[in-house]
């Protein structure tokens, strides 16, 4: 458990780096998945209205829009804290400021934080039960995490830690603690990857099983990212493939798919376009996650799609090592290696290839 005073001392002594002793506070009660209540048409309509407003194409940030988002989203937390989409509302509200990237509009980030903080205070006072209070406190933690991510000074980091610890101590907070602890890990990672790894190492033993599982997955990714991603196999056409041969030349996109998942099969069509458009910048490798008995169907898809790039098919199914190594448990899915062979994007889809290549510094 981290105390406020200990956290402050360690933050100051490490010049705003996160300290190794950054332990998460245990939740007030053991984690348990509460049964979701029956669907409420009124609630679902309210959630739909919020998501439509939040994801409105071309919406321009402004104080008026912020007010609309807050009035549409914040009351849902206290009213429907156990709704399956409450966590998503918290996430959508929590990342509003991060989506403001136009330099001329950057001052609006502070406007958003101010308006949301005021709304959180009012919502917490109006919450009538522990679950509602926990949901509002989760939003407070999400907002503090967002400020810490964008500001990164000792006060914002300390404030985020305090909000998360308060959420952990709140009855009902265990429903939301995993998201906020892992968000805090991302904040710390931007300041000190080594400190983030120490924090995740501690979180993997947390009594909240969801949090412990996510921390374990994150640790696996952190470990993979320490060295170039090793990938060497013989493709279905008999040709050898070794990712090491591409280092310094191309990025690599890993496409995970299964014959039973239509979306992952359709992604071959998008990848064919990328293969011809970006073949000088990226190598595509498809990794099949079907069991051995489905090999005939797998071969048929590869033949019908007229795939030109390497195909890894070993019949291991979802237990394939190249998938398990980076926590791939479902399809469609993907990942990207940069030109140095390092895991750059643990989760990626075909339509993201161009954007990620630009982030890696490839010229178009």
Feature names for model-found ranges:
Residues 9-21:
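Bacterial N-terminal signal peptides
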Residues 25-75, 79-84:
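N-terminal leader/linker segments that initiate helical-solenoid repeat arrays
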Residues 61-72, 106-119, 151-162, 190-195:
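Helix-turn-helix repeat elements of alpha-solenoid scaffolds
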Residues 79-87, 99-106, 119-155, 166-178, ...:
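Short solvent-exposed coil/turn linkers within tandem alpha-helical repeat scaffolds
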Residues 186-234, 244-248, 296, 300-303:
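N-proximal helix/coil linker or "cap" segments that precede and/or mark the start of modular domains
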Residues 242-265:
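Short active-site neighborhood of thiol/selenol oxidoreductases, capturing the structured segment around
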Residues 263-305, 315-324:
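Structural microenvironment flanking redox-active thiols in thiol-disulfide oxidoreductases
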Residues 305-307, 314-359:
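Thiol/disulfide oxidoreductase modules built on the thioredoxin-like
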């Amino acid at each position: 458990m981290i105390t406020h005073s200990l956290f402050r001392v360690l933050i100051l002594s490490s010049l705003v780096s996160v300290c190794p002793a950054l332990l998460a506070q245990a939740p007030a009660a053991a984690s348990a998945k509460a049964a979701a209540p029956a669907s409420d048409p009124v609630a679902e309509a309210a959630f739909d209205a919020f998501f439509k407003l939040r994801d409105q194409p071309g919406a321009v940030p402004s104080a008026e829009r912020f007010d609309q988002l807050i009035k549409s989203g914040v009351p849902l937390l206290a009213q429907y804290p156990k709704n399956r989409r409450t966590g998503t509302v918290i996430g959508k509200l929590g990342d509003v400021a991060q989506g403001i990237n136009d330099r001329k509009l950057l001052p609006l980030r502070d406007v958003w934080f101010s308006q949301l903080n005021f709304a959180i205070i009012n919502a917490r006072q109006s919450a009538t039960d522990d679950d509602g209070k926990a949901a509002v406190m989760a939003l407070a933690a999400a907002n503090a995490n967002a400020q810490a991510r964008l500001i990164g000074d000792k006060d914002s980091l300390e404030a985020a830690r305090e909000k998360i610890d308060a959420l952990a101590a709140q009855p009902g907070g265990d429903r939301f603690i995993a998201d906020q602890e892992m968000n805090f890990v991302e904040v710390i990672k931007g300041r000190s990857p080594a400190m983030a790894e120490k924090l995740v190492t501690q979180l993997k033993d947390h009594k909240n099983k969801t949090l412990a599982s996510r921390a374990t997955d994150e640790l696996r990714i952190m470990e993979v990212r320490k060295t170039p991603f090793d990938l060497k196999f013989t493709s279905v056409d008999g040709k050898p493939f070794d990712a090491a041969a591409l280092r310094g030349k191309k990025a690599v996109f890993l496409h995970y798919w299964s014959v039973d998942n239509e979306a992952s099969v359709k992604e071959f069509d998008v990848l064919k376009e990328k293969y011809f458009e970006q073949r000088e910048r990226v190598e595509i490798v498809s990794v099949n996650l079907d069991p051995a008995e489905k090999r005939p169907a797998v071969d048929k898809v590869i033949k019908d799609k007229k795939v030109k790039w390497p195909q890894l098919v070993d019949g291991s199914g979802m237990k394939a090592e190249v998938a398990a190594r980076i926590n791939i448990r479902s399809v469609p899915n993907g990942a990207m290696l940069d030109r140095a062979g390092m895991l750059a994007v643990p989760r990626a889809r075909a339509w993201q290839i161009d954007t990620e290549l630009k982030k890696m510094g490839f010229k178009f």
